[in-house]
Amino acid sequence: MRPSGRTASQIRPVTITRQYTCHAEGSVLVEFGNTKVLCNATVEEGVPRFMKGQGKGWVTAEYSMLPRATHTRSGREAARGKQGGRTLEIQRLIARSLRAALDLKLLGENTITLDCDVIQADGGTRTASITGACVALVDALTYMRSKGIIKTNPLKHMIAALSVGIYEGTPIADLEYTEDSEAETDMNIVMTETGKLIEVQGTAEGEPFSFEELDELLKIGKHGLRELFDIQKAALA
């Protein structure tokens, strides 16, 4: 039995609120149960030096957690003068995932930065960030078209992400913190709405897992991701 009483494949209630702040070209508050992440998309002219002259755009991301997003206060990384390895890993994952959603040639030499700030953490912050940031990205692209910055929508497909894992011997979807901290296996799946995989990150925290368990994790992950795509589309309707 899961602590929340959810079934093995049941995801938490998910809410996506668009235009959450007034300044960003795309702004979304995404909630997976008690996990809440603010995803803001900023459009800027120009690209990083290594991209100049290629006629393509760029998508990058930054990720952070507010000091009291967790049970105990964590100090601001800015105060320490450097980002931690976990933060760097997560923001690279977010950026890689979102770049896979676009035809960068159609973006022109423009950069979109996704800032994902965790307001409250209860597991699955990186997957919530990707799912919410994709909606913020769509709104930023709409803004760019309305201002004549781009002529054609570069979006190839929506993307979303979901955590899965093995908890007390059972494959489950969308782990909350109490499950994540005790899971025997922890995995994140990033997928396109067409059913293709962008990234699968999986680690046996305790007992190694079998190929049969891997297949089951991918199966319940795909089922949950289908629900997330429906929620994204409803938010954008």
Swiss-Prot record:
Keyword line: Nucleotidyltransferase, RNA-binding, rRNA processing, Transferase, tRNA processing, tRNA-binding
Residues that bind phosphate: R86, G124, T125, R126
Disulfide bridge map: none
Signal peptide (residue range): none
SUPFAM superfamilies in the record: Ribonuclease PH domain 2-like, Ribosomal protein S5 domain 2-like
Alphabetized PROSITE patterns for the sequence: RIBONUCLEASE_PH
Enzyme Commission code: 2.7.7.56
A GO BP entry: rRNA catabolic process
Reaction equation(s) it catalyzes: tRNA(n+1) + phosphate = tRNA(n) + a ribonucleoside 5'-diphosphate
InterPro entries linked to this entry: ExoRNase_PH_dom1, ExoRNase_PH_dom2, ExoRNase_PH_dom2_sf, PNPase/RNase_PH_dom_sf, Ribosomal_Su5_D2-typ_SF, RNase_PH, RNase_PH_bac-type, RNase_PH_CS
Molecular function per GO: 3'-5'-RNA exonuclease activity; tRNA binding; tRNA nucleotidyltransferase activity
Family named by the database record: Belongs to the RNase PH family.
Function: Phosphorolytic 3'-5' exoribonuclease that plays an important role in tRNA 3'-end maturation. Removes nucleotide residues following the 3'-CCA terminus of tRNAs; can also add nucleotides to the ends of RNA molecules by using nucleoside diphosphates as substrates, but this may not be physiologically important. Probably plays a role in initiation of 16S rRNA degradation (leading to ribosome degradation) during starvation.
Quaternary structure annotation from Swiss-Prot or TrEMBL: Homohexameric ring arranged as a trimer of dimers.
UniProt xrefs under PANTHER family: EXOSOME COMPLEX COMPONENT, EXOSOME COMPLEX COMPONENT RRP41
Record protein name field: Ribonuclease PH
Gene: rph1
